[in-house]
From Swiss-Prot:
PANTHER family: POLYRIBONUCLEOTIDE NUCLEOTIDYLTRANSFERASE (PTHR11252), POLYRIBONUCLEOTIDE NUCLEOTIDYLTRANSFERASE 1, MITOCHONDRIAL (PTHR11252:SF0). GO terms for biological process: mRNA catabolic process; RNA processing. Its cofactor is Mg(2+). It comes from Lactococcus lactis subsp. cremoris (strain MG1363). Belongs to the polyribonucleotide nucleotidyltransferase family. Residues 700-734, 744-766 have a biased composition (Basic and acidic residues). Involved in mRNA degradation. Catalyzes the phosphorolysis of single-stranded polyribonucleotides processively in the 3'- to 5'-direction. Mg(2+) binds at D490, D496. This is Polyribonucleotide nucleotidyltransferase. Keywords: Cytoplasm, Magnesium, Metal-binding, Nucleotidyltransferase, RNA-binding, Transferase. It is found in: Cytoplasm.
Amino acid sequence: MAKETFSIEFAGRTLTVETGQVAKQANGAVVVRYGDTTVLTAATMGKMATGDFFPLQVNYEEKMYAAGKFPGGFNKREARPSTDATLTARLIDRPIRPMFAEGFRNEVQVINTVLSYDENASGRVAAMFGSSLALAISDIPFDGPIAGVEVAYIDGKYIINPTVAEKEASSLELSVAGNINAINMVESGAKELSEEVMLGALLAGHNAVKELIEFQNEIVAKVGKEKAEVELLHVDEDLKAEVIAAYNSDLQKAVQVEEKLAREAATKAVKEAIISVYSAKYENDENLSIILRDLAEILEGMEHAEVRRLITEDKIRPDGRKIDEIRPLDAEIDFTPRSITHGTGLFTRGQTQALSTLTLAPMNEAQIIDGLNDEYKKRFMHHYNFPQYSVGETGRYGAPGRREIGHGALGERALEQVLPSLEEFPYAIRLVAEVLESNGSSSQASICAGTLALMAGGVPIKAPVAGIAMGLISDGTNYTVLTDIQGLEDHFGDMDFKVAGTREGITALQMDIKISGITPEILAEALAQAKTARFQILDVIEATIAQPREELAPSAPKIDTITIPVDKIKVVIGKGGEQIDKIIAETGVKIDIDDEGLCSIFSSDQSAIDRAKEIIAELVREAKVGEVYEAKVVRIESFGAFVNLFGKQDAMVHISEMAWARTAKVEDVMKLGDVVKVKIMKIDDKGRVDASMRALIEKPEGYVEPERKPRERRDNKDRRNGNGFDRRNNDRNNHNNNSGNHSFELRERKSHVDHEFPELSTKKPE
């Protein structure tokens, strides 16, 4: 295949696709260039069907060379995917997965490799576009294309694929994907936006998606391959009819048992009895394994059909609830002692239960993120754990998987919108959600538990946040939207639409579906139903704890902040860290200073924090014109005296500014070590300070300022050295730097006295 290039302008950038040049042994491969972001996507398919599920794997690989950076760590090589890469892979997987045929079992891999990275041209958007297109032009059976975009909301306007600056100004961060007809994936964080604004964003995003799909269709028409014939998993129709006729009523009764564990036991007993009958019947048949495989699919299909029939026809849910009814709710705080942990919340919804624990720490404990973007500190972390005991099973136990990372990130987006600013609350914040029981919607339970933990821990959040999961049963013509779906409804339903927010608006959305897409009407109904449910949950949370506690837990670290000028950071740190180490040694605190000058001081002892803050304030303090100080005399010269205002800040009091009457000698007015009251009169551009004592003394009645003789012009040699360098500036700097070399300063001040106050001059007339 020869190289082909296709380009369009999309959302203010050039989108270019290249095919036929690289990765030609893959079933399909494309290079997508969006702005200066370049992503190579390759799609491959296994030769044979495997297993009883569809093994789709989507990867998003961030290569550090793409941003001109070295990987961190000892080995200087990319290792496990970053959290962002994992979330991006999930983001691409979710809209692609529903686009494969029922019964398709061949393994499919879609690998996205970021070759160059432009922070203002989304790698996620490019990779999702490339994933769909690589599958669409390949011989892999794929009912696409799909595409996705990012949407921002600024000043009442929706912006497609925003830049970094636009994202920072936006009250919405939305990823939306779909096919030409409908939306099939949503992921969003928002600053308490209304349902109407969110729906508008989804529709604006889908309109942009349609443009990308039309572009893909043009490319497929020119370079697409003929789709391969693959064997789909089909059950024996005669066997299916036989089993349904004989056992459907038994399975229906089992499915209608309301309590989860009892229902699971009942359905398991019915299925095992049926399998036992057919195992004996076909014991000697060489196709026994295929028969049993088909039988498992048939029984799963029967259960699937009964759950959906109950909901759509009888309007009865498996646990007996109404379509829009929430399971029983319970909320509790302080599950563990406040003397040890910083805040806990236990939230229960039916048979789903989550325990969230808050930990506060200074900002130097924040997570450092070093990816393709510039390195930064992540202040808020929400981690989600799903142990197998929560569903009464044994299984894998270890590092979090993609699902746990994804659910943690969803909770993080939902809650971070209501957190106080770093200036208001100078802590790094970590929430860990332990799912203790699960029967659906555990991610939303973790959000509710997180709200309880934050409020119990004294974090001054703007408002409590609650989350609810909505479901959908659709036959293509009619549909039913379900509130608070349980595990069975999630498993056999068509949609899992999670909505989190406050009473003011939505803070997070996530939608996954198993059908090709859903309409705006369904989305609007689901959002409205979710709002009603969210308010019910907030009632329970607020009845448990109405406002965040005013005091932190006794076990929480004490932190205070002081903002210092950026140019003073080096003063606080000192040469080689000498100054900051001295403060730490004296007070026993720990100190963290960010690039913006926010200085966080933390300790278990509040008095130590106060002392450290006092020292730092003194170090960065600056004199201001008009301020009055009690200053100590630190040096006396014939023309005046130097006084210490505070710290290392000195000021010069000229002899003429010591009194209204003529002062013959400085020593007549003050001596070393005296404390005198002075007023700041002038600060020059080099930071040198002139002060006055007489400005604080009432002018004598009838006082007349002495007449000053005009200055005589002197040869430059009197004021400059042989290189033309002005010695006066250097002289004064020598004093300010405590160098001890004041010879130039003396000459400067002596010359000043001679010219300005000839009556005080000791110089002989020329």
